[in-house]
Amino acid sequence: TIHPVNPKYADVLGYPCHPSLEAIPGTVDCAAVLLGDKAILPTLKAAHARGVKGVWAFASGFAETGEQGAAMQREIRDFCRETGLLFCGPNCVGYANITDGVGMYSAPLPRAFRKGNIGVIAQSGAVLLALGNSPREAGFSRLISSGNEAALGLADYMDYLVDDPETAVIALFVETIRDPEGVADACRRARDAGKPVIALKVGRSELACRVAATHTGAIAGSDRTLDAFFRRWNVIQVNTLDELLETSILFSGLRGAPTTSRRVGMSTVSGGEMGMLADICSDYGLEFPPLSEEGKAGLRNVLPPYAPLANPLDAWGSGDLKEAYPASLSILAREPAVDLLIVSQDMPSNMADEQIAQFSDVAAAAVRARADSGKPVVVVSNISGGIAPSIRKILDDGGVPVLQGSTEGVGAVAAWLDWNRALAEETEAPLP
């Protein structure tokens, strides 16, 4: 039940409006405060007196504005510590529990929103909105905007997601780490729980540090120190929002036996794209083991005589997407030296119906290769901007992630391999 509170109105959007928190009948679980900066602390006090357990505030005007604002923020912090009131903000867009369809979030969510197992914590509200509205169609469980973190901070939200059964992947947009010990403990708990933490940390340049300070009052730490911090706790680092999404999507949906090697098989339908992807894979240190004689013999039986038998494999030559192409993918995936299969196939959402039908066969072949081999299979669409919904459903149902963008897709695969290797080694790199 929603209870608007404003002494100036009798109703708001059809809901009866109350003159004060005290006037609301029954229990109040949480409160969204849409007031100016100087009204936040008095409202928190009123909420606590009313028995409210959690509060979110949208207002800015605190530590990011200078000493006067910082002093107000410290008062909020001290009050919340003394009372145990859970406070999200200030200067943030709130949070959304996507799984259960509840929350206090200052923006509408897309109509076609994918529920999933990726929990996001962003210290920038605009970034959280961008991720939530992205056409890349990541499946989210929770969206959390932490803002200035006057009371609850990054470590608190991470602890929540580590314990959350609906969240399997934790994605972070970080401007600063205010509580290194708490965040380190949360990262360790995430690692022990088998939940990957993927972080985009800004502030490598002097300009970015200044922007962070004026945005949320954040003090960005040494880039070298933070790199070492993330390496120590096996946090996957990315550089762009697209990379953050694609890497999270891969970890969210990849099925098959984990591998610590970098030996991959790759199938393409284009010689040009094969060369492009080979360069990118080389940049990320991925290896293409040669085909076994048995593998070559199997491919020789399903591909035309002129088709080159190699890894990466150009399997388009047969033109037979119903039998020859699926068979060639399965043969490549079953190669003893191949631990993961990348299928390169562009699948933009605006394709003609005939192409959608054609490339649906490619998606089905990728699913069959995963089932036949028991190994992880990933589809990479080199063009971003959305995947044809019917094709996505085939891949989702078959446990095959589809990634958008060549660099983002290959980078996500490399990150998954690195993460598996670090877990197997169980090493903690020392801080500088």
Residue ranges and their predicted role:
Residues 1-432:
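Catalytic-core regions of core metabolic enzymes
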